[in-house]
Amino acid sequence: MSQLPSLSQLRDPHAFLRRHLGPDAAEQQAMLDSLGLGSRVELIEQTVPPGIRLNRELDLPPALDEQAALARLRGYAEQNQVWTSLIGMGYHGTLTPTVILRNVLENPGWYTAYTPYQPEIAQGRLEALLNFQQLTIDLTGLELANASLLDEATAAAEAMALAKRVAKSKSNLFFVDENCHPQTISVVQTRAEGFGFELIVDAVDNLKQHQVFGALLQYPDTHGEIRDLRPLIDHLHAQQALACVAADLLSLLLLTPPGELGADVVFGSSQRFGVPMGYGGPHAAVFASREEYKRAIPGRIIGVSKDARGNVALRMALQTREQHIRREKANSNICTAQVLLANIASFYAVYHGPEGLKRIAQRVHRLTCILAAGLERHGIQRLNQHFFDTLTLDVGGAQTAIIESAQAAQINLRILGRGQLGLSLDEACDENTVARLFDVLLGADHGLSIDDLDAETLASGIPEMLQRSTSYLRHPVFNAHHSETEMLRYLKQLENKDLALNQSMIPLGSCTMKLNATSEMIPITWPQFANLHPFVPREQAVGYTLMIEELERWLCAITGFDAICMQPNSGAQGEYAGLLAIRKYHESRQQGGRDICLIPSSAHGTNPASAQMAGMRVVIVECDDAGNVDLEDLKAKASEAGAKLSCLMATYPSTHGVYEEGISEICEVIHKHGGQVYMDGANLNAQVGLARPADIGADVSHMNLHKTFCIPHGGGGPGMGPIGVRAHLAPFVANHPVVPIDGPQPQNGAVSAAPWGSASILPISWMYIAMMGPQLADASEVAILAANYLAQHLSGAFPVLYTGRNERVAHECILDLRPLKAATGISEEDVAKRLMDYGFHAPTMSFPVPGTLMVEPTESESKAELDRFIGAMLSIRAEITEVQNGNWPAEDNPLKRAPHTMADITGVWERPYSIEQGITPDAHTKAHKYWPAVNRVDNVYGDRNLFCACVPVDDYR
């Protein structure tokens, strides 16, 4: 009788690893065989320079299986205490409609998509973002809006920068209302320091004492007061300065829009439009301006254009403003945004419609009026005369007793100095909330009845002169999907227009579109993580603290750094935060004159944009013919900079997709001249477990948790870009004015609105590392294997532009299409669009080298999917040969006409190739056809005829 396997033999500690990796062991071996290799070890020996290799297992706890990891994280979550938080300050309770929760936030068709650079396969989320822009335009009363920024505080900093760019005033002074949210003031102070702006934080009544280029005003202000801003705005305009207004989006349903008051820029958070507080984020900021500032506005703008058949099509407009084009001359270093959260907010508006939204706002205001009336009758002094949802109270010596009573009732109030308290009501509040507040503030024997107060004619807290009279959201999209059936189908219709990871590989170079495992995603909607206000007392967030501290320890083990700053909520913000730490470090050593930042010519566009934001001068270091940093040019420029050298920004592996042999020497050159090394973490997926940035010589590096550590891209955000630093830089990273962080110097300003950035998505990365453990190195190795497998099989058709040692690439490779374009006129864009007909998202176009495609397959794609991509690319190469041989006209062939749509086959087909060749060019497309929603979009038309609001329905006819 055969012996049954024992429990120890049946234990499967690497079950998740096998789920995460695309190719199984046999497929990996087949791929290695095709490369002439016997093992992954041999591949790594041939690829990664021996001098930087880790050569030991990562110091991480053993991998947990999915259920064990979820159980452990649940244990952390249960240590968070979810109280009724009425702290306000830009964060409010909200109710996410379940149809949106299930079909958007929990749907990989929405959260695994990439930024819509390829509009033909992104029309669904482009429409959702256009709705978001329309929502912003209507509520703010301005003409132009972008498709979201990272948070309200960074939006304020962007508003200040825009004001300086466009204001005719010659002043270098920017005014900030002292009654803005404190986190906003801190982020603006941080940004002003980098730009060299003078900043005045004062009462708005003193604005007229100053000559400024702009001012930041809050409406309603942080204490709830609603002020008529017209006199202040008129004064600013008289001195050719800009008025930038931070507004509460829900209040604008009842308040006169700031644009009607004369504001030039309006921004705020869309968080209370259905996005949980999440201990600080992620949330989509709204940002609107006058149309005349369209070339200066930061972030993505979704515009209306036409496709090749003349039909309405959407696209990202005016991209020449952005960092990937303009580099150090860009308006901003903004790279990602908060698309997934902007979509949720826009769908919240679509689902509720104008009347539903108004009802929510009116209900919040009515509850606040009832509360205010009851308190007033009991002699509680209210410090803000007018209000929407926020009351600031002077309770004098009763403050301590009231705080204790609130704690007993599990209610968080805003605790202010001088015997004052603040409270903000929200959508999640009801009559019971107000009754509990009466008990807390007045004692149980107050004798007030909510019903009796509600039956009275209570005065509005909004002054009559500031009550909204203009209509909003009249477009049909906001008035047609109010039943759940209609909303469900609308969401599905939009989703079907887009291509995401749930349909096929997205081989975008430098983007790391790997698996976002379901087990990693589940915890983000747990109430214990989703419903915490970022400014609750730390004892209510013990679970978050334990999870974040453990994640920081793991990231230190992975990177070799001594400390982690979790605050940056994007990779570009991480760059900025790291460079600020370097700047403060030099200043602490009386070397504040070090302001030259060396950047290789191949760098991401965010690098020079971030450097100029941190107050540095950018000097470009050339690359040699092999794509590596020119060491002699680096030495010469470092020597020339001398005592002015601040740092080098370098990406590793390089943006050219190779492990540079001289990286350690490059770091030594910088250190020899007194500089610091900033390592861009965009390509960390090729380092984890194989090498560590700090060991290589980096002093600081950001980690894209939305690339390497599995936070999904969300169609263009959210992201997280925490930085790792060596010990000497640790005191100089960001702190926070509301929730001080242990470690950094107390005087350090914030770079994001919340202390730990977008904290509610950190469980995703925690889960990934917990389930992979030391075997994270396997992911890096398989990613490198997949890239070399593609390079090997495609190099005969499309030359691989750069290779490293032994002709190997790192985790991505650049295919050079320039010779083919010169010979045939077929461009990299034509190939990108043709790939859509094969059911693929294109690789990264023309970065870092124009006329090329950069391909990154990641470790998560199966051999079958890699082979399908290879087959598609080789088939496209054969199509190019047909053009080259004259069998198809140069301008009328499947590549120039790509992508093909349903409209093409329902119309008259008069083309030199068959419908089958155009529509279903391979076996996969015959069985699993993905239809692009529109034909090729006309980029030039869209920029020349900028239109960034919802399209009239008749335009689709």
From Swiss-Prot:
The answer on whether this UniProt entry bears the keyword Lyase reads no
List, alphabetically, the GO terms of the cellular component aspect.
cytosol; glycine cleavage complex
Disulfide topology: none
Q: Tell me, what's a Pfam family for it?
A: GDC-P
Q: Which residues carry this modification: N6-(pyridoxal phosphate)lysine?
A: 707
Q: Does the keyword Repeat apply?
A: no
Give the protein family. Belongs to the GcvP family.
> Per its database record, what is this protein's job?
The glycine cleavage system catalyzes the degradation of glycine. The P protein binds the alpha-amino group of glycine through its pyridoxal phosphate cofactor; CO(2) is released and the remaining methylamine moiety is then transferred to the lipoamide cofactor of the H protein.
* This protein's name: Glycine dehydrogenase (decarboxylating) 2
